[in-house]
Curated annotation (Swiss-Prot):
This is Probable thymidylate kinase. GO terms for molecular function: ATP binding; dTMP kinase activity. It catalyses: dTMP + ATP = dTDP + ADP. ATP binds at G8, I9, D10, G11, S12, G13, K14, S15. Belongs to the thymidylate kinase family. Its EC number is 2.7.4.9. It is an enzyme of class 2 (transferase). Pfam families: Thymidylate_kin.
Length: 192
């Protein structure tokens, strides 16, 4: 039916919004990156150990996981008539690895084997709010530093402007954010 990517900095409410969308929309298949497949599990384990000293390695691992994730999980569910909603996709690599110094061209090239989603939505929140949410849920990972989140947010907003992605104010109540996202998805699904 349709493939939707929900993007945004850590602490922007992606997981919460997606779980609300599962209740609001019919035939939703929710997934996330890193995936639950072997490469995704490797990435999660790798991140716990501090990741690579070179962000290009992280970008390559995420791209490999994304290809596998798309082919094994996303594409088949779309063909089965689901609205597949992924928490993170290519824009996460552009934003996060970009903020770590990897060129946008490199990230796009290594992700060229997977298609763009039918709709990419950016959940935007001030990094200080995001950081407070992250601390509230129990800590921070490698990429979850305030100055880093600011860089990532800047890249997301620049990409939204370049690509015409809708940007949703995620500082509001999760139910309000989910209602706005659901309306955007309904518009895309209706015209497919």
């Amino acid at each position: 039916m349709a493939f939707v990517a929900i993007e945004g900095i850590d602490g922007s409410g992606k997981s919460t919004v997606i779980s609300l969308l599962e209740k609001k929309l019919p035939r939703v298949y929710a997934t996330r990156e890193p995936s639950s497949g072997p490469i995704g599990r490797l990435i999660k384990e790798w991140a716990l150990k501090g990741g690579s000293v070179d962000p290009h390695v992280d970008a390559l691992l995420f791209a490999a996981d994304r290809i596998e994730h798309y082919k094994r999980e996303i594409e088949p569910r779309v063909r089965e008539g689901y609205i597949v909603i992924s928490e993170r996709y290519i824009e996460s690599s552009i934003a996060y690895q970009g903020a770590a110094g990897v060129s946008r061209e490199f990230v796009k090239y290594i992700n060229s084997l997977v298609p763009k989603p039918d709709l990419t939505i950016i959940l935007d929140v001030d990094p200080s709010i995001a950081e407070a949410r992250i601390r509230q849920r129990g800590g921070a990972e490698k990429y979850e530093y305030l100055s880093f989140l600011r860089k990532v947010r800047e890249i997301y907003l620049a990409r939204a402007a370049e690509e015409g992605y809708p940007v949703i104010d995620a500082s509001r109540r999760p139910e309000e954010v989910a209602a706005d996202v659901a309306e955007l998805i309904k518009r895309v699904v209706r015209f497919k």
